[in-house]
Amino acid sequence: MKKELLIFGSNGALGKGVTKVLLQKDFDKIYLFDFDLTNDKISMNKTVNIQVKDLTKEENVITALSQIKPDKDIYYFLFSTIGGFWGGETIWETKYEDWNRMINLNLNTSFLLAKHFSWLVKASAGGSICFTAAFTAENPEGMKGAYGASKGALIHLVKTLAIEGQKINLSANAISPYIIDTPANRSWTPDADFSRWIKPEEIGEIVYSLFSNFSYISGNVITLKDRFKS
């Protein structure tokens, strides 16, 4: 049975690290989806680069996934880094458009990917999907209400999909990082202890472990906070 992988957000800070790891694994083909592939387009025999448009629009998700054809001899896997952060204001200070922006970026895009990837898996041998949630989704923090709510709803989506996915041989999980070691995060918190942060490449290994055992690992949210002090 063949194994094919879809990575959405492959060109972002998290996506690049995860992609670097998963390119070395035993997938027969890897589809790399992102909004901008001009600078870091990966060309390997088993990779396909696909540029996408606004994924909050259902027609764009359908167009992106229509390039992969159902096949009863293929297991399909999807990892998504799609989302965004916004914070710094209380609930009463939060503008409705900012609230909606977080819901659109973090929940609605994930719903659309889950919905249409499920149809692909249903017509194939089976598969697994893994989303990127956030630590604050299950551990509320002030000034992150819209972000936390959107990621919390994403976790509910994942757990529901894990239940329903049993009917079509689809498992669903999420990783839930606190702070990922990226250049942007380092610049925002220059005095932090970077040695305790999880790296994108380490997340790639975790995602691969979930996919390697997809037939019985489902409905889980893998919390990734700080590593032990050395």
Regions found by a protein language model. Name each.
Residues A114-K115, K159:
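A short, exposed helix-loop element centered on a Lys and neighboring polar residues
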Residues T94, P140-K144, N185:
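Active-site "substrate specificity/gating" loop of NAD(P)-dependent dehydrogenases
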Residues G83, K122, S128-A153, V158-K167, ...:
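Catalytic loop of short-chain dehydrogenase/reductase
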